Curated annotation (Swiss-Prot):
<keyword id="KW-0067">ATP-binding</keyword>
<dbReference type="GO" id="GO:0046872">
    <property type="term" value="F:metal ion binding"/>
</dbReference>
<feature type="binding site">
    <location>
        <position position="188"/>
    </location>
    <ligand>
        <name>substrate</name>
    </ligand>
</feature>
<feature type="binding site">
    <location>
        <position position="278"/>
    </location>
    <ligand>
        <name>ATP</name>
    </ligand>
</feature>
<dbReference type="GO" id="GO:0005524">
    <property type="term" value="F:ATP binding"/>
</dbReference>
<dbReference type="GO" id="GO:0005829">
    <property type="term" value="C:cytosol"/>
</dbReference>
<feature type="binding site">
    <location>
        <position position="314"/>
    </location>
    <ligand>
        <name>substrate</name>
    </ligand>
</feature>
<dbReference type="GO" id="GO:0006094">
    <property type="term" value="P:gluconeogenesis"/>
</dbReference>
<feature type="binding site">
    <location>
        <position position="52"/>
    </location>
    <ligand>
        <name>substrate</name>
    </ligand>
</feature>
<feature type="binding site">
    <location>
        <position position="194"/>
    </location>
    <ligand>
        <name>ATP</name>
    </ligand>
</feature>
<comment type="similarity">
    <text>Belongs to the phosphoenolpyruvate carboxykinase (ATP) family.</text>
</comment>
<dbReference type="GO" id="GO:0004612">
    <property type="term" value="F:phosphoenolpyruvate carboxykinase (ATP) activity"/>
</dbReference>
<protein>
    <recommendedName>
        <fullName>Phosphoenolpyruvate carboxykinase (ATP)</fullName>
        <ecNumber>4.1.1.49</ecNumber>
    </recommendedName>
</protein>
<feature type="binding site">
    <location>
        <position position="439"/>
    </location>
    <ligand>
        <name>ATP</name>
    </ligand>
</feature>
<dbReference type="InterPro" id="IPR015994">
    <property type="entry name" value="PEPCK_ATP_CS"/>
</dbReference>
<keyword id="KW-0464">Manganese</keyword>
<dbReference type="InterPro" id="IPR008210">
    <property type="entry name" value="PEP_carboxykinase_N"/>
</dbReference>
Length: 524
């Protein structure tokens, strides 16, 4: 118990430290924390919070970190006094109880990883941490020294939030100087995952290393590919390839040695999960995986089509559950980077080659377009721009990440492509969704290098280089103007989308890099 004195908890009844999967499973069952499915996967309900609470996330405003953090709606400031008050409250919640302490690494690169200790009173949350982070060896556990501690007091709420000037009784707070995070009022496991991701996005760029919200895989010739894209763009599907080993599906770093996964597991959406279309994820849901907010049938099988609790049903599992993964969780420098956008306006080409400067522009734009349905059945796509394809998790100014990306692209001569997995031949409602077959053909041509041999032409207004012909893709598809019957509607929509890009980018022009990068966007 002595080694846990620095946690600041009183009268702890018992500490369950780094339990095995079997031990965690026994505790989950004994504590009645959920149910087991027909194949013995444990399944929990995260309560009213079935997703992250971005409006309740704060950083303590103090020096020296205050001069690096980009303060605003995403990185909200909180005082040291209020942090201390809520940390004390969380510690009181965790005192006098049985607690679970789970130690893990974030980052598969020895020179860049961080050691994180998680403290919780819920066994399944320790299980989630064991799945999602890198599991230390026995020797590493014996010499474990935490760089950062997360207190997860999910049962603790802040009743005084109004007088404290906060948004709700939930709080997720990061104290960079003291290397502590505290979570209260939400049971959602993803807060721990994305919280440490946010911290990696603070630490690494200050060490001149890039942190990224992307998936990564590696081919038989050790050629590494990175896939960036917002939710619904096909990032997980397209990076899962039987011919390539999965490095990771969501969070990566890029240091002097190459690319490395931050995590030791995957956190996949399970809504409408189909064993035929996503056999790898379906096969990964077995003992040691942890299902969240799914609905079980009477025979304890999972009804993946049931969204009655939430659309955001999830499963976490150790990456070993994916057969074709890269065991070291790392590889060399990327050969190709692919930005995925599901453009519901039907304007972006199926594939375009980007210059280094354009890569920085489209990385900062982080564009996709979602389809919003209305009750009368009228649909108008909604443009979504998320800096660096992961704005909610980036504590520094987005141009910091873009500059690092540009430097690495140049140094390692990386090819960068923009791939549209969205609509063609018209906007949503008129055009049709790009076929997965055509998108796969574009991705394969990038990965096998055959696209480099193509003849390219300029795509007007956006000034993108697009291939004139590409094996496996109808030539008419390659330039969007050829796929629209109504050319006037095409020109109007193209100019409208270009204008959205330009307007969005104005927010980066508060720094000189932003002004510099803005030259490489669409020209209206």
């Amino acid at each position: 118990m002595k080694k846990f004195d620095n946690l600041g908890l009183d009268n702890i009844k018992e500490i369950f430290h780094n339990l095995s999967y079997d031990e965690l499973n026994a505790h989950e069952k004994a504590n009645n924390e959920g149910l087991s499915t027909d194949n013995d996967t444990f399944c929990v309900d995260t309560g009213i919070f079935t997703g992250r609470s971005p409006k309740d996330k704060y950083f303590v405003k103090q020096d020296p970190s205050s001069k690096y953090i980009a303060w605003g709606k995403i990185n909200q400031p909180i005082t040291k006094e209020l942090f201390d008050k809520l940390l004390t409250k969380a510690k009181q919640e965790l005192s006098g109880k049985k607690i679970y302490v789970q130690d893990a690494f974030c980052g598969a690169s020895l020179q860049s990883r961080k050691a994180v200790r998680f403290v919780t009173e819920i066994a399944w949350q320790a299980h989630f941490v064991k799945n999602m982070f890198i599991r230390p060896s026995q020797e590493e556990l014996e010499n474990f020294k935490a760089d950062f501690i997360v207190y997860n007091a999910c049962k603790c709420i802040n009743e005084d939030y109004k007088q404290d000037g906060l948004n709700s009784e939930v709080f997720v707070i990061f104290n960079v100087e003291e290397n502590i995070a505290v979570i209260g009022g939400t049971w959602y496991g993803g807060e721990m995952k994305k919280g440490i991701f946010s911290m990696m996005n603070y630490w690494l760029p200050l060490e001149n290393k890039l942190s990224m919200h992307c998936s990564a895989n590696v081919g038989e010739k050790d050629d590494v590919a990175l896939f960036f894209g917002l939710s619904g763009t096909g990032k997980t599907t397209l990076s899962t390839d039987p011919k390539r080993r999965l490095i990771g599906d969501d969070e990566h770093g890029w240091d002097d040695e190459g690319v490395f996964n931050f995590e030791g597991g995957c956190y996949a959406k399970t809504i409408n999960l189909d064993p035929e279309h996503e056999p790898e994820i379906y096969g990964a849901i077995k003992r040691n995986a942890l299902l969240e907010n799914v609905v079980l049938r009477a025979d304890k099988s999972v009804d993946y089509a049931d969204a009655s609790k939430t659309e955001n049903t999830r499963v976490s599992y150790p990456i070993e559950h994916i057969e074709n993964h890269e065991p070291s969780l790392k590889a060399g420098h990327p050969k190709n980077i692919i930005f995925l956008s599901a453009d519901a306006f039907g304007i972006l080409p199926p594939v375009s080659k980007l210059s280094k400067e354009q890569a920085m522009y489209y990385f900062l734009s982080g564009y996709t377009a979602k389809v919003a349905g209305t009750e009368r059945g009228i649909t108008e796509p909604q443009a979504t721009f998320s800096a660096c394809f992961g704005e909610p998790f980036m504590p520094l100014h987005p141009t910091v990440y873009a500059r690092l990306l540009g430097e690495k692209i140049e140094k390692h001569e990386v090819n960068v492509y923009l791939v549209n997995t969205g609509w063609s031949g018209g906007s949503y409602g008129v055009g049709k969704r790009m076929s997965i077959k055509a998108t796969r053909a574009c991705i394969n041509a990038i990965l096998d290098g055959s696209i480099a041999k193509c003849e390219f032409e300029n795509f007007e207004v956006f000034n993108l280089a697009i291939p004139k012909a590409l094996e496996g893709v109808e030539s008419t598809l390659l330039n969007p103007i050829n796929t629209w019957l109504d050319k006037n509607a095409y020109t109007e929509t193209r100019d409208k989308l270009a204008h959205m890009f330009v307007q969005n980018f104005k927010r980066y022009e508060d720094v000189k890099e932003g002004i510099e990068f803005s030259k490489f966007g669409p020209k209206i």
